[in-house]
């Protein structure tokens, strides 16, 4: 099902459909430059270990795993196929851990662990999570190829990437978030640079999943005059505006993210410490029914309002204070970004709606009652953004990740990009 808001001109929409039947087969000069902002785990992440690093086992010794490193001792932390092997899963989890420092009121890496995001400004780290396993770890490859082939975009010229350390999240006003705030500064500079290198054209920001939350808050933290000059449109794919119920399973029992052979309990520890994972927990703004539990156990049930008790009962009481002070205020209001927005998401896919735990407790995987959504994010969350100049497109049967490669989904995304670029193509045609 497709829904388009009345804020868009009917005349323009009809003209676009009639005159652009071949989608957006434009030349590069007829497109607004586009920056991709990935979702959680949607780009490569590199690490190096210094003398302060204390391995949890001999398998995790820096001289043993990994053997091959880049110049300066850097190596890929995400994604690395060695995580599939049990002895190295723990090493991976140790190195992905974040620690909350109450004195700094901020998160930081484990001692001795330095991380960096490679290829900022390029799509290189978004195409594949592991270049050696391109088919198995393809992420935005199909989307980028479609933009090049169908819309005339040129990779790393009119289409760029804004990867980030997806473990970190933003914090509420008055609380520091050094890493994520630096990403917003880098993104702002990239937008300005991209516009300058493309004849001063404003930029389209195209996000997937968690990237949509970052873009929304990024736009909220800029001035109206800056947005008018530099931002043409915000296109959000599968954005979890109000979080997702499946994230409670991540905290309670661990989530392998579809990676085979991995024990979810081995990765649960670092997943709980991820600041961005807390950001993706179900919000009371969307999951506001106090009579409808999201997690059911023999002893107690939990709604979105009992997150502090949920944290304590799963054995993560240290997460209560930073969640309530830093993260929760971010989720309580979805502010208008001040630019035209197009939300594209799937529906009609079984999506966790209630997690039911038995006598085995949270170390066992739950039985799941399903509802509507994209398989990961619940429909209520996908549709939660209610702002001016909003265009909403729903695609039946498309999942949270397949929206980046499904043929029908890509066709719809290209169509929406063509609508945005249509005005520019007309102006250029008149001037020729």
UniProtKB/Swiss-Prot annotation:
Any GO BP annotation: lipid metabolic process
CC per GO annotation: membrane; plant-type vacuole
InterPro entries named among the record's database cross-references: AB_hydrolase_fold, LACT/PDAT_acylTrfase
Topology of the protein relative to the lipid bilayer: Single-pass membrane protein
GO MF terms held by the record: O-acyltransferase activity
Gene: LCAT1
Record's protein name: Lecithin-cholesterol acyltransferase-like 1
Principal location: membrane
EC number: 2.3.1.-
Top EC category: transferase
Catalytic residues identified in the record: 209 (acyl-ester intermediate), 374 (charge relay system), 400 (charge relay system)
Xref: Gene3D superfamilies: alpha/beta hydrolase
Pfam families (UniProt xref): LCAT (PF02450)
Family according to the record: Belongs to the AB hydrolase superfamily. Lipase family.
Subcellular localization, as worded in the UniProt entry: Membrane
Keywords of the record: Acyltransferase, Membrane, Transferase, Transmembrane, Transmembrane helix
Spans through the membrane: 7-29
């Amino acid at each position: 099902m497709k829904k388009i808001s009345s804020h868009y001109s009917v005349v323009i929409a009809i003209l676009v459909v009639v005159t652009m039947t071949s989608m957006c087969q434009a030349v590069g000069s007829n497109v607004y430059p586009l920056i991709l902002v990935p979702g959680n785990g949607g780009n490569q992440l590199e690490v190096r270990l210094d003398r302060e690093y204390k391995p949890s086992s001999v398998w995790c010794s820096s001289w043993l795993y990994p053997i091959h490193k880049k110049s300066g001792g850097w190596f890929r932390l995400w994604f690395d196929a060695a995580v599939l092997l049990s002895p190295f899963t723990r090493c991976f989890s140790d190195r992905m851990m974040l620690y909350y420092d109450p004195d700094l009121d901020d998160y930081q890496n484990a001692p001795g662990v330095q991380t960096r995001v490679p290829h900022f400004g390029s799509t290189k780290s978004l195409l594949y999570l592991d270049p050696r396993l391109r088919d198995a770890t393809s992420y935005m490859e199909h989307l980028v190829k479609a933009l090049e082939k169908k819309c005339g975009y040129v990779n790393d010229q009119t289409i760029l990437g804004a990867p980030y350390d997806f473990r970190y999240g933003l914090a509420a006003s008055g609380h520091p978030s050094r890493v994520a705030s630096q990403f917003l500064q880098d993104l702002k500079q990239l937008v300005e640079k991209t516009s300058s290198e493309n004849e001063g054209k404003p930029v389209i920001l195209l996000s997937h999943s968690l990237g949509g939350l970052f873009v929304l808050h990024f736009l909220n933290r800029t001035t109206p005059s800056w947005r008018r000059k530099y931002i043409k449109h915000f296109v959000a794919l599968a954005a979890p505006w109000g979080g997702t119920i499946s994230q409670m399973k991540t905290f309670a029992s661990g989530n392998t993210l579809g990676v085979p052979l991995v024990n979810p309990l081995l990765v649960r520890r670092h997943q709980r410490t991820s600041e961005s994972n807390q950001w993706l927990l179900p919000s009371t703004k969307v999951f506001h029914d106090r009579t409808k539990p999201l997690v059911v156990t023999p002893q107690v049930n939990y709604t979105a309002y009992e997150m502090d008790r949920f944290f304590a009962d799963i054995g993560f009481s240290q997460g209560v204070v930073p969640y309530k002070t830093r993260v929760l205020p971010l989720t309580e209001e979805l502010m208008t970004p001040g630019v035209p927005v197009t939300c594209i998401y799937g529906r009609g896919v079984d999506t966790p709606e209630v997690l039911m735990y038995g006598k085995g407790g949270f170390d066992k995987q739950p039985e799941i009652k399903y509802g509507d959504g994209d398989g990961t994010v619940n429909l209520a969350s996908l549709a939660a953004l209610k702002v001016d100049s909003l265009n909403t497109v729903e695609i039946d049967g498309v999942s949270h990740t397949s929206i980046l490669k499904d043929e029908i989904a890509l066709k719809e995304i290209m169509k929406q990009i063509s609508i945005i670029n249509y005005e520019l193509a007309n102006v250029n045609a008149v001037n020729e």
